[in-house]
């Protein structure tokens, strides 16, 4: 485990994190971008530029910076990128305009990387999870109307366990058996992410 602050809102911080990871572990085989901050629950007309920037810089820009910085090492290892997006973007959830915009930007960035980096043996995929976390509980308490409008019990009858039902999918996506899967979005929402 590398003991670093992995904030992704500026190039210098990202370069330092990547350098420390390479110095500690000898390279990079897998990049997972899942950090995100936002002002979810605020309707679009009430969103401020600062709230919008928070979502874009902590999510979309962070993924962009980390992907660029890790690319040489991922190319060397024929590695994998797993980016986290959200049903908020897929389904246009109420009160989540900045978060949805950042997450859909990440999906677009991921598809471009899958196209451009495939020749280098790098596969790039996206996961849209729905897990019961402390952040989801905080969202429920802070924005009960937006929570009620957006978050329903999945058909599977429970929210995902982050470690066993989402983390293990990430592990599998990084394995050689799944190397040919690239440019895809997997919706891990217990049946809520049904799409044509």
Locate the predicted segments by residue.
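Rossmann-fold cofactor-recognition segment
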Residues: 1-10
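Short C-terminal tail/terminal secondary-structure segment
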Residues: 41, 91, 170, 182-196
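Substrate-binding pocket helix/loop in short-chain dehydrogenase/reductase
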Residues: 42-44, 48-53, 147-150
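Active-site helix of classical SDR
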Residues: 67, 102, 110
């Amino acid at each position: 485990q590398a003991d670093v602050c992995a904030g992704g809102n500026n190039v210098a911080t990202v370069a330092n994190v990547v350098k420390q990871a390479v110095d500690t572990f000898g390279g990079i085989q897998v990049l997972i971008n899942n950090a995100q901050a936002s002002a979810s629950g605020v309707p679009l007309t009430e969103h401020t530029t600062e709230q919008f920037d928070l979502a874009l810089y902590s999510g979309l820009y962070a993924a962009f910076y980390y992907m660029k910085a890790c690319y040489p090492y991922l190319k060397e290892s024929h590695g994998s990128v797993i980016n986290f997006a959200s049903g908020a973007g897929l389904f246009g959830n109420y009160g989540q305009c900045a978060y949805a915009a950042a997450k859909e930007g990440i999906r677009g960035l991921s598809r471009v990387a899958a196209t451009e980096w495939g020749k280098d043996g790098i596969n790039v995929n996206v996961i849209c999870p729905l897990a019961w976390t402390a952040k989801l509980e905080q969202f429920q308490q802070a924005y009960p109307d937006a929570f009620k409008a957006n978050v329903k019990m999945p058909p599977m009858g429970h929210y995902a366990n982050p470690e066993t039902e989402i983390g293990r999918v990430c592990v599998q996506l990084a394995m050689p058996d799944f190397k040919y899967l690239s440019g895809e979005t997997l919706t891990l929402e217990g049946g809520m992410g049904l799409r044509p």
